[in-house]
């Protein structure tokens, strides 16, 4: 009997062990089938802005002020784009045909400081930019890996975006609205929207063409008083322009023109051209000039950008020597450092719900959904095919509708800055920074204050109300 009990005992022990093993195995299988609790949840936002150009920063700032959940992702490693990294410190004013300024909104603070002389040097612009971008959650140096697009009927929604940062970990996020705010279509180029024809249409070219980029030139030891004096000695202004070229003008702060002189300069590098000068006096003998054009730059290709920057730096000493001999006040000038980036004035633009056209500008058309007012001359800068560029007149004030900043096929993708939906002639005016900056800020305000209604559903009656609070609360007038 003892032996039988012993067998039963051993059988019981073995059965229990087997059950434990089976139980453990089934637990392991269940654990494998169940998602790991450590898997990161997908973060959701109200607004995600791609890129840190000043326009999108202003949009994001207003959204943050309104309490929306915002994230800025910059594919560039350094912030500020054209304004900060490209050092585009010659600011173009925008006026109507009665010479009334059309610069409004937050960007007016930058222009006021610029005109007053308190914002002229790189450190001044950096201080302004830092103040505006403060409080906006951001990550720089990211790579956009994948976009998830949902289709509903004839429309599309950008559902989610996956990116990775310097550490390499992939992150997927969702957002109610996405904003293209780079100068090379980092986001919109992935969304399969039709490209708006560009500079090639001016001369019936077959391949896409773009206005030249600019490499800004910094100088020191410039005698600005002498430059001013010499130009005054050649007055009246008609004589100045006959001698130095159209649009030549010098005051205590700014200088433009001198194309009769610069046209005699031949660049060492045939990809470059020295056009007429737009110069800002930064005080203490320091001057920055917008005048060196670089053709065929692809801002989406880091190698193309790096090559253009190197070409600009290599040409600068020869330009310095030329200016010393030919422009009053530059006899003892020296180079004063180099920007790390370019002023990209034109790249691909994709169709929006309304594409602004040349007749809209020249007929001073106002739209029911205006988000900005433009008025800059229609200025198409040079390409290899049209080296000197071409102008198409000066419009009076005209409107830019919200629909020109909404990607055509999408209900939740916005564009800012030089991504504005405009035909190439209209773009020659609409591209100017204070015009697109006002549009971006206005859109940011609307996103916050109209958060309970999709932008696509806003009506003419809504915009009548919107215009009222923009005027009262922000001193922004859009008619």
Q: What name fits each language-model region?
A:
Residues 14-24:
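Bacterial N-terminal signal peptides
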Residues 148-172:
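Conserved beta-strand-loop-beta-strand element in the redox core of flavoprotein oxidoreductases
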Residues 41-53:
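Beta1/beta-strand and adjacent pyrophosphate-binding region of the FAD-binding site
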Residues 43-45, 167-177:
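Core beta-strand elements of the Rossmann-like FAD/NAD(P) dinucleotide-binding domain
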Residues 24-36:
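Sec-dependent signal peptide cleavage junction
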Residues 56:
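N-terminal Rossmann-fold NAD(P) dinucleotide-binding loop
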Residues 169, 177, 184-186, 192-477:
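Flavin (FAD/FMN)-binding glycine-rich loop and adjacent Rossmann-like elements that form
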Residues 62, 68-69, 74-150, 156:
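Conserved N-terminal/central alpha/beta ligand/cofactor-binding core
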């Amino acid at each position: 009997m003892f032996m039988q009990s012993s067998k039963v005992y051993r059988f019981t022990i073995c059965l229990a062990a087997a059950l434990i093993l089976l139980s453990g195995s089934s637990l392991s299988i269940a654990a494998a089938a169940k998602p790991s609790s450590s898997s990161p949840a997908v973060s959701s936002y109200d607004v995600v802005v791609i890129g840190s150009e000043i326009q999108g920063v202003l949009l994001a700032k207003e959204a943050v002020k309104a309490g929306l959940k915002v994230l800025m992702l910059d594919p560039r490693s350094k912030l500020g784009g054209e304004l900060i990294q490209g050092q585009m410190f010659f600011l173009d004013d925008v006026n109507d045909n009665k010479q009334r300024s059309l610069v409004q909104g937050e960007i007016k603070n930058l222009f006021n400081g610029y005109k007053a002389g308190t914002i002229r040097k790189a450190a001044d612009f950096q201080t302004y930019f830092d103040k505006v971008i403060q409080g906006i959650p951001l990550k720089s140096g990211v790579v956009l890996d994948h976009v998830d697009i949902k289709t509903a009927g004839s429309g599309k929604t950008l559902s989610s975006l996956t990116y990775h940062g310097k550490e390499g970990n992939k992150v997927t996020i969702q957002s109610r609205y996405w904003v293209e705010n780079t100068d090379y279509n980092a986001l919109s180029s992935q969304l399969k929207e039709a490209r708006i024809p560009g500079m090639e249409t001016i001369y019936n070219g077959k391949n896409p063409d773009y206005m030249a980029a600019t490499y800004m030139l910094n100088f020191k030891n410039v005698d600005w008083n002498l430059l001013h004096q010499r130009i005054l000695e050649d007055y009246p202004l008609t004589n100045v322009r006959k001698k130095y070229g159209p649009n030549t003008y010098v005051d205590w702060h700014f200088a433009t023109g001198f194309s009769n002189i610069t046209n005699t300069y031949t660049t060492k590098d045939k990809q470059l051209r020295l056009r007429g000068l737009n110069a800002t006096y930064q005080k203490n003998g320091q001057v920055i000039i917008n005048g060196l054009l670089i053709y065929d730059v692809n801002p989406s290709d880091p190698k193309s950008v790096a090559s253009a920057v190197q070409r600009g730096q290599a040409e600068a000493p020869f330009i310095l020597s030329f200016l010393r001999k030919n422009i009053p006040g530059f006899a003892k000038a020296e180079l004063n450092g180099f920007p790390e980036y370019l002023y990209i004035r034109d790249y691909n633009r994709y169709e929006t719900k309304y594409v602004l056209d040349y007749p809209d500008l020249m007929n001073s058309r106002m739209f029911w959904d205006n988000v900005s007012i433009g008025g800059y001359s229609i200025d198409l800068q040079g390409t290899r095919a049209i080296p000197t560029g071409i102008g198409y007149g000066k419009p009076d004030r005209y409107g830019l509708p919200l629909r020109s900043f909404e990607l055509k096929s999408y209900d939740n993708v916005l564009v800012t800055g030089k991504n504005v939906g405009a035909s190439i002639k209209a773009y020659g005016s609409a591209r100017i920074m204070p015009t697109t900056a006002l549009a971006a800020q206005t859109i940011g305000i609307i996103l916050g204050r109209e958060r309970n209604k999709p932008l696509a559903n806003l009506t003419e009656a809504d915009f009548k109300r919107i215009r009222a609070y923009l005027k009262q609360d922000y001193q922004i007038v859009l008619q």
